[in-house]
A protein has these predicted regions:
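Active-site/ligand-binding neighborhood in enzyme catalytic cores
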Residues: 134, 138-247, 251-255
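A short alpha-helix-loop-beta-strand transition element characteristic
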Residues: 53, 76-97, 176-183, 298-301, ...
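Dinucleotide-binding Rossmann-like beta1-alpha1 core, especially the glycine-rich loop
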Residues: 59-145, 155-157
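Conserved flavin/dinucleotide-binding core of flavoenzymes
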Residues: 2-12, 335-470
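Conserved Rossmann-like nucleotide-cofactor binding loop
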Residues: 25, 46, 279
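N-terminal Rossmann-like FAD-binding beta1-loop-alpha1 element of flavoenzymes
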Residues: 15-40
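Glycine-rich FAD pyrophosphate-binding loop
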Residues: 34-56
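Mid-domain catalytic core of redox enzymes
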Residues: 12, 242-354, 358-368, 372, ...
Length: 470
């Protein structure tokens, strides 16, 4: 662990900033403050939070978040700084597997007429689809950041968009086959249509339909490479296996009680950035204003259970050109082809990488099963959708995310002022502050870091280059 700075010890603190959590929010904050005297405490034995992947030769197995933004995104700047590379996803990202058929090409507006649906189901699909398109366009408008606008203003608009009704209520009564399709897509955010706002549901589709909003790239080598590389550059300033049990703000410093391998120790800092899930922040940070504590406690998280599958095909396969398929009625609600980003002109390497996950109610059911039972259920349904996979499976990894995604529930906008308020020397960061994704988490972490930097500058704290370390 990096020793405290002599200059900061003279000021009665060990560090300028303690960052709690080494997910992408915490690491983005640490990267922003890499010239300052900082320390990052992460309770797990690895960095990255919900960004988990495992390398497998030419491929990788993804077990968590995997969608990166384009060149104007904050994630893209972090990727560039880390010397890594993302590539645009070439395949269809809105496929559907319904009643034994797959439709994964062409305009989504044609799907109701190409899927094996009854006339009543087709009509229901068209009516609900038109309502969804209208709401998605509204989401696209309000989600765009205006010139000179604070990120907090965008967050307030996004969480407030159509948050007075549920997604299910907005779509209205649907044919059962159509309801199952929208349920599968809603479960992508780990909740059911009646649990999320109409705006949250619209946002799921807006991010797929709008190229300016879409997170439509994959990190070459797997998502975990980004947090791993940032942590490697930050070196001993990132401490894993370090569980922060208490954060106590005081007038001129913040005390942090952390459990390390040698026992519980206390550290202090000018600022603490709590880059932890909302419920963890609520548990560890003391003396929060009552409305902020209540808001953190009321952020709902849904589960998902993920399966990553390494395949061993020797040549091209029918799904090479497809990236994502929604799979209503299966043990999982989404199927991804993470080798799709590698498919294009030139030689196709043998093998492949698939990922499935079940969120929302599907995730809750899966959490009650053993890993072996989950694997059997996943493979059975993969074979029913992609029969050619049978006999090609080389490895399966199951991962459980009990608190996966902080979905937007009705009335969410009423919590936002309490989450955005200034809390003195404690700063909040995380994807729960807006529509949950990696970009939001990274932006929130960097924003918190810049606020801490401004505070340190006002206090006249020296730069890292001006310090003499013991």
């Amino acid at each position: 662990m990096l020793p405290p700075s002599a200059n900061d010890m003279d000021r009665g603190v060990d560090y300028e900033v303690v960052i709690v959590g080494a997910g992408i929010a915490g690491l983005a904050a640490a990267w922003e403050l890499r010239d300052r005297n900082i320390i990052v405490f992460e309770s797990a034995d690895r960095v990255g939070g919900r960004m988990r992947s495992e390398p497998r030769g030419h491929y990788w197995l993804n077990l968590g978040a995997h969608l990166f933004g384009g060149p104007d995104s904050h994630l893209a700047r972090l990727v560039d700084a880390a010397g890594l590379e993302t590539k645009a996803i070439p395949g269809n990202r809105m496929g559907l597997a319904v009643n034994g058929a797959i439709v994964a090409s062409g305009a989504p507006e044609t799907y109701p007429f190409r899927l094996p649906l009854s006339p009543a189901a087709r009509l229901s699909f068209v009516k609900s689809g038109l309502r969804l398109r209208w709401a998605a366009r509204g989401f696209q408008r309000i989600a765009r950041r205006r010139t000179g606008e604070l990120a907090s203003a965008v967050r307030a608009r996004v969480v407030g968009y159509r948050d007075d009704e549920t997604f299910a209520g907005y779509l209205g009564a649907m044919h059962p086959d159509v309801a199952s399709i929208f349920r599968a897509v809603a479960e992508r955010i780990t909740a059911e249509p009646h649990e999320i706002t109409a705006g949250c549901g619209a946002g799921l589709f807006a991010l797929l339909w709008d190229s300016k909003l879409t997170m439509a790239r994959n990190l070459m080598g797997g998502s975990a490479l980004l947090p791993q590389t940032l942590a490697r550059h930050l070196s001993e300033r990132v401490v894993t296996g370090a569980t922060v049990e208490e954060v106590v703000p005081e007038a001129t410093r913040v005390r942090v009680r952390v459990r390390l391998s040698g026992g519980v120790e206390e550290r202090s800092a000018r600022y603490v950035i709590a880059a932890t899930p909302a419920h963890v922040t609520h548990r560890i940070v003391r003396n929060l204003p009552a409305d902020t504590a209540a808001a953190l406690a009321h952020i709902p998280y849904g589960p998902f259970v993920c399966g990553a599958i390494l395949t061993g095909e020797s040549g091209p396969m029918p799904w090479d050109g497809v990236y994502a398929i929604a799979t209503p009625g299966k043990a999982f609600n989404m199927l991804f082809n993470h080798a799709n980003v590698l498919r294009g002109p030139g030689r196709r390497e043998p093998g492949g990488s698939l990922m499935v996950y079940g969120g929302g109610d599907s995730g809750i059911r899966l959490l009650q099963m053993t890993d072996a039972q989950i694997q059997d259920a996943f493979l059975r349904d993969i074979y029913s959708i992609l029969p050619a996979v049978k006999g090609l499976v080389r490895e399966v990894i199951v991962h459980r995310w009990e608190y996966a995604i902080p979905y937007i529930a009705p009335g969410r906008s009423r919590l936002q002022p309490a989450l955005e308020r200034l809390l003195g020397n404690v700063l909040l960061a995380g994807d729960y502050l807006e529509f949950p994704d990696m970009e939001i988490a990274a932006v929130a972490g960097s924003e918190a870091a810049r606020m801490a930097r401004r505070g340190l500058t006002r206090e006249g704290a020296p730069l890292a280059s001006e310090r003499v370390r013991p």
